[in-house]
A protein has these predicted regions:
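Aromatic- and charge-enriched surface segment that lines or borders ligand/interaction sites
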Residues: 113-160
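Surface-exposed binding/hinge segments that line
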Residues: 116, 161-223
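Ligand-site clamp/hinge motif
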Residues: 262-308, 436
Length: 562
């Protein structure tokens, strides 16, 4: 899906808004560290109050599970949803998405039971016939269409949903103010909705970028509110009609969210009575798991510090699960400022990435070149990562006429202690071959501000590329002028374009292999390592397992056995 002409920057900016939301709030541990650090100063009193409440109710015989996370939650209003997984998961416990990925990266029906297309432009969404609201009213196509219309409202102004892809929506992602319908999102019958896109897209892109993020609202309840009121209506703070397994009872978006079971959940009443999401600093997760105040953590929402991994593994009361490698410690090179490909190649050859993985992450991860890891079905395992070869690096620098006078400005997130250490190793290895680097350690907000300029040479951030749908991220990051790399290539662009015109997994794999090989060759970015993050679950819990995707899909089956 190529973006052309005057629309390009509008669409790029829309993509960037979603990507930044994802980088800042998704399970990216860089963000988790910075957010958690900010929240930690205030966490104490809130944590005490929710813990004491949990103890009282547990004593009365209620079953309660506490989930520990390190990312703050912006809002629980589905119309204000950003690209972050914690935001989506916390809200999706009440308002189901149409589809969700499961632990094996298959799309699983949540509110919908099928999504089909014959032409990659018209997507037919069928709502599960059994789906009902907690007040007994059936979930219908009217609810889905109404929610989509409001998500595209310029009055509400959600900047993350990228609805510009649908017919009838402007290139800014919004409909006209006061619009009563969207041409590209139409009711077919009571349980069927047709979504029509302006250009072809693979069904996986539709499912991953749109079906997973459309959290349907009950039209019959909230149509009483004007568009202006929907952003601030108090109803969203304590909704009384939901489609999901839980209903929020209390929350502080910086500290906790408390839920009670929806006993009328149409997929089956939850086995537990209450669920709490506790937002804590990463350094508090080990103590919480040890004491039993936290029952479960998830690999991307719960940033257990690397230095605590062995301690968590040693706990007798929890089982540890390492997630699939999805969080890519990406290092972006601004090619405008480092234009010689041989210099960029030398920068990669000079780094002993395997040693960094073993020493700083205890081997919990992998080394890849490009964007895709072994977690993706499109990963090409025949692509051998560039090996550590400082002599090759020196030779390339000599061929490039590198005189060592330029100092590489290397921006790093101060909240990611592991990569702060890795950056020091990288800078030393660069120095050993004749590349001077000055590490600029800044907070995450500053890092993102710098990323929006070209005033850097190298910038590192943890980034999760959706394994089943990497296109939006890759297309932006290699989008030429204005992107984090400033890099563009015709062969690569052609492969990306073709990836949007096929639904054949093998062809898609071949096309993304072209992309990763070109990235390996030209080095506009490189992966320092890909993290297999740690999750843990109390042995008193059944039916629950930490997983990168699908964590809450069957939360109604979670149970307490003690």
């Amino acid at each position: 899906m190529r973006l052309k002409g005057g629309v390009v920057m509008k669409k790029r900016n829309r993509i960037l808004s979603l990507l930044l939301a994802g980088v800042m709030a998704l399970g990216l541990t860089a963000c988790g560290a910075s957010n958690a650090g900010a929240a930690a100063d205030e966490t104490g009193s809130a944590a005490v109050s929710t813990e004491s409440a949990s103890s009282d109710t547990a004593a009365s015989g209620e079953k309660i599970i506490n989930v520990g996370v390190t990312n703050t939650i912006g809002s629980i209003n589905p119309l204000l949803l950003n690209g972050g997984e914690i935001n989506k998961y916390a809200t999706g416990l009440m308002f189901l998405p149409l589809m969700e990925l499961d632990a094996d990266l298959n799309f699983e029906g949540m509110l919908a039971d099928s999504i089909t297309t014959e032409d990659n432009k018209n997507f037919i969404v069928h709502i599960d016939d059994a789906a009902t609201w907690s007040d007994g009213t059936p979930v219908t196509a009217d609810d889905v269409v109404y929610t989509a219309l409001r998500l595209a409202s310029p009055v509400i102004g959600n900047t993350a949903m990228m609805y510009y892809v649908f017919e009838g929506v402007g290139d800014d992602g919004f409909v006209e103010e006061g619009a009563e319908s969207i041409d590209g999102i139409q009711k077919v019958d009571d349980k069927t909705v047709q979504f029509t896109t302006k250009e072809e897209m693979p069904i996986t892109t539709f499912e991953n970028s749109y079906a997973r993020y459309l959290l349907t609202l009950p039209k019959h309840v909230i149509e009483q509110y004007s568009e202006e009121e929907l952003s601030t209506a108090d109803w969203f703070n304590h909704p009384d009609v939901v489609s999901g397994p839980f209903i929020v009872t209390d929350f502080d978006v910086d500290h906790y969210i408390s839920y009670e079971a929806n006993k009328d959940y149409w997929k089956g009443a939850p086995k537990i009575d209450k669920l709490n999401i506790k937002i804590v600093d990463g350094s508090q997760l080990y103590a919480g798991l040890q004491s039993g105040e936290i029952d479960i953590t998830q690999q991307t929402m719960s940033d257990i510090p690397q230095e605590d991994y062995e301690s968590v593994e040693a706990l007798d009361n929890v089982d540890v699960v390492y997630g699939s490698p999805v969080t890519n410690q990406s290092v972006f090179i601004q090619t405008k400022n480092v234009p010689d490909v041989k210099v960029r190649q030398a920068m990669l050859y000079a780094i002993d990435r395997q040693q960094i993985l073993e020493e700083l992450l205890n081997g919990h991860g992998e080394i890849v070149d490009g964007f895709l890891s072994s977690a993706s079905p499109f990963y090409d395992d025949s692509l051998t990562p560039v090996s550590y070869d400082p002599e090759k690096a020196k030779a390339l620098l000599e061929e490039a006429g590198w005189d060592g006078s330029q100092t590489i400005r290397f921006y790093v997130n101060s909240g990611d202690s592991t990569f702060v250490n890795a950056a020091s190793i990288i800078a030393a290895e660069w120095a050993a071959v004749g590349i001077k680097a000055e590490i600029q350690t800044v907070d995450f907000a500053t890092l993102m501000s710098v990323a929006g300029t070209e005033d850097y040479d190298v910038l590192a951030v943890q980034y999760t590329y959706a394994p089943v749908d990497p296109y939006p991220d890759v297309a932006w990051l290699l989008g030429g002028e204005g992107s984090w790399t400033g890099y563009s290539d015709d062969t690569l662009n052609d492969a990306l374009t073709k990836s949007q015109l096929t639904s054949d997994p093998e062809e898609t794999k071949e096309l993304f292999s072209v992309v990763d090989k070109k990235v390996q060759e030209d080095v506009p970015m490189f992966s320092a390592y890909v993290i297999s993050a740690q999750g843990a679950v109390s042995k008193r819990i059944t039916g629950a397992a930490p997983s990168v995707y699908g964590f809450f899909n069957d939360v109604q089956n979670w149970d307490v056995v003690e």
